[in-house]
Amino acid sequence: MPTIEEILRAAKEAGASDVHLTVGIPPNMRVNGNLITMDYPKMLPADTLEVLVNIMTEVQRERFEERGEYDMSFSIPNCGRYRVNAYKQRGSVALAFRLVGTKVPSPEELGVPESVIDLYQRKRGLVLVTGPTGSGKSTTLAAIIDKINNNRDAHVITLEDPIEYLHQHKMSMVNQREIGIDSNNYANALRAALREDPDVILVGEMRDFETISVAITAAETGHLVLSTLHTIGAASTVDRVIDVFPPHQQQQIRVQLSNTLEAVISQQLIPTADGKHRVAAFEVMHANHAVRNLIREGKSHQLASVMQTNRKLGMITMDEAIVQLYFEGKIDREQAIQFAQDPDSMENKI
């Protein structure tokens, strides 16, 4: 069986974003969204266990045994940096590797809209980047952090599980804390961050009521807070945040969110027309007066209408972004319909 380094290098040469190791089949890699079997022997329990032992410290292995899963990062010189999730299945070890890369892409390279890039200048408020797993949320946030780092005198604290992109101290001071190593959980790390004189706080994921509550408070008290949610679309994102809270608190949270939210950016990665790459589609909602009123009044279902009538402010719905990609020839009709929020309407538009 080849070493994990050989497997990951081969996958990178093939343009893979992810590599999966599990017992009973050869290693698999994901290329442009498609899962492909690699040309290696089937993996035995001893093979995946050996990979685990080689990439983890003793402390990390102990935590893996306790929890049954473990998130970490792993680097190979002259190859790349990987986000790794190790987990148990049928009593054996399985691992998922995601290539992160060593250089933070610029927003322009990612195709991030200019109105989103400009968010790096904000001094306070809540910015949410949302989308399904593997849609590039953490890369978009890393690009915004890098923009801040290159252009602002700021103290940036990132809370990540695990740390993906490594930021050097440039114009800003960037302190990166890994959940499970530098702090026990997001909520505790976020509370501590408020006592560490930050200007900008990145929360890798708003997973629970406690973290969301502290994040909103942090944005209220004069910090720029950046985070992610696994939602698609501004309306579902607002609803998700509100619904985390018990009914008797929801009106208060609507008011707080309407005052603190700066923008919601939702993204999806869509296969290109030639099938060789993927291109990002971005929905962008900036919190202007109309948006804040709708959030306060619990009328999130009307947010799409505000976005459609405020294109000049940099707003765009997901389906409008997909239509734009289609008419630019970047994606085909089938993919446009498949990734649309309203497939029936999309069929009529294209």
Predicted features and spans:
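Short, flexible helix-loop junctions that flank or precede catalytic/ligand sites
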Residues: 1-350
